[in-house]
Each structure stands twice: as structure tokens, then as C-alpha cells.
């Protein structure tokens, strides 16, 4: 027997019973971002490797260990996108969208990272990305956070996700803090784990994000970035916090919050849940004013966020009842009436376009069809048999309530269904 081919580890199939949650989530994303008049942009999943090395940072875990990179037939180094911001900026510069313009853009699609697969972490994963260009102040950052909160409310998730904030300040203040942090950590290098010792010489800010419990006392005594902020950075962060307070958006200032991408400045934020274990971050973002210039464009203020759809789906399954709803399951009794049943079902769809109607065209027994009807979650079973066709009637059975089934003429069926809706 030929051995079957399996999916690549960490790249999972999304099965039909899961799709309703994905559709619900994706529709909510589109609805919320459109309400703020953000416009969709689409760009390739494959980019030149140099794009990510320049923007994400060569010393980051993503570039060092996680990217899917290959050489094509022309000898060019290409990479499956590990995140969307760099590609969005590249597309904006190349197509003239960013020069002296204000832009509000969004995208939704797959990203790829060679990480260790676990619950909520995959090698192919989907993100909603939202990016803004041309607006330098804290108000646009507040708008992004308001948008996130509106999305959580639309999904019914606002009670299980909380907001954490920090500021990295300007590049100058960040560099001053970096030096102070390195000096402190070097004085206690023997207490660091192997991963942190490596990061000490490549990306020391990432040590603050360590989940190793043995390092937490050491990190608690580390210099605080807020003590190295210049006055402009302080005012910026104070204004953002004031806006969130006025809008009654609860938040926690987390001084150890840093992002794993080198291009962030000023504000960074994460939306976090305690219901997914180690993979608690469901959305993250911040400001990255230097990124457009880094990629060859004119200096342009920019801010945005990305939300992980797989993690949001995991949360959705815990709070939303089954989203795969059927209104009517049409039971067709006997092969002789399948054609008539099919045509009648199509007529029902014509007059009830918002209803979900499934016709059983299997020709199997009534018992089997009623089992499938009940399992489908449908509210009604509509029975079409030879006797009903002769008398121009149908039998309507309520599957979710214990009430007598009804025999209705075809003329009275539609008004009755609409009244019972």
C-alpha cells in the first residue's frame, strides 16, 4: 500500500467544522476595520530575504532561526514572509502610496515561521495586520487600540483579553537604555541562562521578555527604560495614557514589554489572555517611525498592529456556541422524489435568501436522514415524500422543541416559516 502524504509539521488543515469560527472572525475583522475607513492591501507571501534582514534585524530570533528562506533558480535569496509590516511598507514605497500621504491600510493572510509547534503557535499562521502612515502623534496609536477593543467586543472576547503598554522612546533614548542594561547584565552574566547570554551580545532588550522564572528576580532589579526617556518621549506616552483613561480603556504599564522586532520606537502594546497558556499574546503592535526610511522611502511616521487569528479562534471556541447554523434540513423520502425535492428546495432559497437550507440528496432511509438532520443542528426538518407531492403539501418537524409536526400546503409554508423565523 502506498504511504500517504502528510501535511508539513506545524502547518495544519482547517476542517469544515472549524470554518464557521474563521468566517465569523474574518467577517468581524473586515467590518471593524472598514468602519474606521481603513483600506485593504494585498502583497506577495514571498519577498527578497534582504527585506526582512534589513527591517526585522539580523540579530533577532526570527531572522536567525525562524525564517523559511530558499534560493530560487536565478540564484536570488527569497523568504516566505514571517510578518506583514515589512512587506506592506515595501509595497507602499514601490507603488507611491506613502510619499507625503496619510494612509490607513489593512491586510489578512498567512505568515510563516519555523518555530516549535504547540497550541496557538504554528509554522503557517494567519494574521490581521493594520498599518497607518503619515501620523506622528499618540492619537493614532489610541485609535489603533480603540479599534482592537471594538473588535474584541464584536467577537465577545473583551472580558478575556487585557491591554499591556510600554514605551521604547526614541532611538537615542533606547540606545542609552540599551547600554545601561548591557552594563548591568554583564555584571551578573553568570546568573543568565544560555539563551540570555547569547542575546546579551546580539539583542539585549529581548532578555527582558524572558519567560524563565529563575531570571525574574534579576530582571526586576534591572534598569528601567522609563528612567532613560527624553522629555518628548515622556509627553508622547503620557498623552496616550491620558487618551485611554478618557475613553475608559483599562491598561497595565508593563516596563518589561519589548517587541521582538528591531524597528519599534515609542509605543509598544500587547493584548494578552490568560486562557492560552504560554501563547497568551493575541495581538501586538506599536510605533515604527524609522522603518519607511530604512527601506529607502522618505522619513514617515508609522504605527500598526497584528492579531493572530489562530489564537483568536481558540478563544472564540470557548465563548461562542456552534456557529455552523442550518435553518432547514430537507428530508427527501425516496429516490423517486429527489428531483422534485431538489427543485422545491431551490424555490425555498429564492423566497428565503437569508436562510441556510440543506437538502439531503442521498436517497437513504428516512431514519438515516433524520439522524443527519438532528446532527446538523437545524431548527426544522422539512419532509418531502410521494404523498406530500400528490397532495401539494409538506410536513414540517421542529427539531429543537417538543411540539407536534405540522402538515402545511406549499402556499402556507412560507408565511408560516417567516412568522416563526
Curated annotation (Swiss-Prot):
Q: Name one GO biological process term.
A: histidyl-tRNA aminoacylation
Q: What is its main location?
A: cytoplasm
The residues that cross the membrane are none
Q: Which GO terms describe its molecular function?
A: ATP binding; histidine-tRNA ligase activity
UniProt keyword Nucleotide-binding present: yes
List localization entries: Cytoplasm
Which enzyme type, at the first EC level?
ligase
The protein's name is: Histidine--tRNA ligase
Q: Which organism was this protein described from? A: Coxiella burnetii (strain CbuK_Q154)
Give the taxonomic lineage as stored in the record.
Bacteria, Pseudomonadati, Pseudomonadota, Gammaproteobacteria, Legionellales
Q: Give the gene symbol.
A: hisS
